A protein has these predicted regions:
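Alpha/beta-hydrolase active-site loop
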Residues: 1-16, 35, 227-228
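Short glycine-enriched nucleophile-adjacent loop
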Residues: 30-41, 46-47
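Accessory cap/linker subdomain of secreted extracellular hydrolases
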Residues: 47-135
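Short alpha-helix in the alpha/beta-hydrolase fold that links the catalytic acid
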Residues: 140, 154-168, 192-193
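C-terminal catalytic histidine-bearing segment of alpha/beta-hydrolase fold enzymes
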Residues: 160, 171-240
Length: 240
């Protein structure tokens, strides 16, 4: 939700000695980060990892009729000032939504695959301009990071579309599109992942993602490159 708490957080940071405000998010939070940065010009560094270039229909996770996730009818994932943002509706409703995930996941080698939800929903109808994220409004520095072998959605394609959108529209941000052949959905900096999982990182990744099992060296190289690039960008941004 893009709500007053974002603005409150920015003002609090600035009032407590922070000259600059940055934002970082991965997966659904990557989309959230992009939207927030497009609304708040005080955000001058954005790291969007595996982010989509559009807002999605809302969804819930838990247990409903044997399903672990389901779409919420006529609901957006994000809102602004109490009003839902336009969104791409999923072509599948409950319970078919989760059944499609199960079908795609079966025998894939991934603990979960959901690319069909997004591919089929995009085929069912063209995106409206209203539901696309206005990345051209983002200020400062913008890093768009994703991998072609993402098992959740087509992160690489979304980054290329944002790249094209920025080429076609006036913007002031300095942006860097980073699309890797191998990296899985977890295109996090290596050091950050190791903080979260100091022991057994490679085992966990191989258990979750087939690509991490088949291309362990390439995926690790991707994470280390991301670490290097984002760390350098953060250091430069802080020094400006």
């Amino acid at each position: 939700m893009i709500n007053p708490s974002h603005e409150t957080a920015i003002k609090w940071l600035q009032a407590n000695g922070n000259r600059k405000v940055g934002i970082m998010g991965m997966s659904t939070a990557g989309m959230d980060s992009l939207v927030a940065a497009s609304y708040f010009p005080d955000i001058t560094l954005t790291f969007a990892l595996t982010a989509s270039d559009f807002v999605w229909q809302g969804f819930e996770q838990g247990n409903k009729d044997g399903c672990k996730e389901w779409p919420i009818p006529e609901t957006s994932t994000l809102s602004w000032k109490g009003e839902p943002l336009p969104y791409m509706p999923f072509v599948y409703e409950h319970p078919v939504y989760w059944q499609k995930i199960e079908e795609e996941t079966k025998g894939s080698g991934d603990i979960e695959r959901s690319t069909c939800l997004f591919i089929d929903s995009e085929k069912a109808r063209e995106h409206t301009e209203e539901e696309m994220i206005k990345v051209e409004n983002i200020k400062g520095k913008l890093f768009l990071v994703g991998a072609e072998d993402d098992s959740f959605w087509e992160a690489g394609k979304y980054i290329r579309r944002m790249d094209q959108r920025l080429k076609e529209r006036p913007h002031t941000c300095e942006y860097v599109p980073l699309v890797y052949e191998h990296g899985t959905h977890f295109v996090l900096p290596e050091s950050m992942l190791r903080m979260a999982l100091p022991v057994g990182l490679k085992f966990v990744l191989r258990f979750i993602f087939r690509a991490a099992k088949e291309y362990p060296k390439e995926c690790e190289a991707t994470r280390k490159d991301i670490d290097k690039k984002l760390s350098a960008a953060l250091k430069e941004w802080r020094a400006e």
